[in-house]
Design a protein with these regions (language model features):
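Recognizes the extracellular SEMA beta-propeller fold with strongest preference
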Residues: 93-96, 102-104, 112-113
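Bacterial N-terminal signal peptides
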Residues: 5-16
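Repeated scaffold domains used in trafficking and secretory/extracellular systems
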Residues: 20, 56-66, 85-98, 122-134, ...
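Beta-strand-rich domains and repeat architectures in extracellular enzymes and scaffolds
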Residues: 20-64
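Surface-exposed loop/turn elements that mediate protein-protein interactions on large endomembrane-trafficking
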Residues: 39-52, 74-87, 106-122, 143-158, ...
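Short beta-strand elements that form the blades of beta-propeller/WD-repeat-like
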Residues: 26-33, 66-71, 97-103, 133-140, ...
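Short, intrinsically disordered, low-complexity segments enriched in Ser/Thr and Pro
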Residues: 59-79
Length: 234
């Protein structure tokens, strides 16, 4: 646990020092590799490094500029501790120092704060794909849409056919052969077939898992880019 806490502190810092070279390496975020190992991503755009495994047996993880949460089989782990949770993976919607969490195996929503979970009485219809405060991306028989906890519709995403990630002020989603980043009234598309998952890697990047590799998608407006990550791809 101590090693994990130190790693989280490093990820939240502005820079890391790469001990072997003495070079300051900016922290990008975290990914879960094909073995279920949590690994830090460091470097600069187009030149990334995957750090050593910090935790094994990870089913899900998400990071923002303030918070990283990890789901093992039966716990949610943070930089400050851990709490018991339903078995299986989790979908995280991070907001400041809190998060909304969805547990697919029991179809239950909860609010995470200070290493405790409060069950929510949300009864959202359809397959939950992503969460942000008070909004949920779901797949239903008529397609993918964003809804409120009472199931009222906010917006349809007619182009989406694969994974979806709700951002604070936008959305990333997959079509059959593209990744679409939509925010600030604009849209950027990248070629990417066979997308399996889209997760929050850090404050400025999301992780795209597709056909045996992981990409880092930079989401900063005006600097949108898609980069292939090195190393242990799924």
């Amino acid at each position: 646990m101590r090693r994990l806490l130190l790693l989280f502190c490093g990820v939240c810092a502005a820079v890391h020092t790469w001990a072997q070279s003495g070079i300051e390496v900016p922290a990008i975020g975290m990914i879960v590799d094909s073995s279920g190992d949590l690994r830090p991503v460091q470097g600069v755009a187009g030149s990334f490094l995957l750090g050593p495994t910090s935790m094994s047996g990870v089913l899900s993880a998400a990071c923002s500029d303030q918070l990283c949460l990890i789901k093992t089989d039966s716990k949610i782990v943070s930089a400050t501790g851990e709490t018991d949770a339903p078995t299986g993976p989790a979908i995280f919607g991070l907001s400041g120092d809190e998060a909304i969490v969805f547990f697919p195996e029991v179809h239950t929503f909860a609010r995470w704060h200070n290493d405790s979970l409060e069950t929510l009485d949300w009864a959202v219809e359809g397959d939950v794909l992503s969460i942000r405060p008070k909004e949920i991306a779901v797949r239903r028989h008529d397609g993918i849409s964003i809804v409120r906890p009472d199931n009222s519709a906010i917006e349809f995403i007619p182009d989406a056919s694969g994974p979806v990630l709700l951002l604070a002020k936008g959305v990333v989603f997959a079509t059959k052969d593209q990744i679409v980043l939509r925010q600030d009234g604009g849209e950027v598309r990248f070629a990417s077939a066979g997308t399996q998952s889209i997760t929050a890697m850090g404050a400025h990047y999301v992780a795209i898992r597709a056909r045996g590799v992981i990409y880092a998608l930079r989401i900063d407006p005006g600097r949108e880019s898609l980069f292939l990550l090195p190393g242990n791809a799924p």
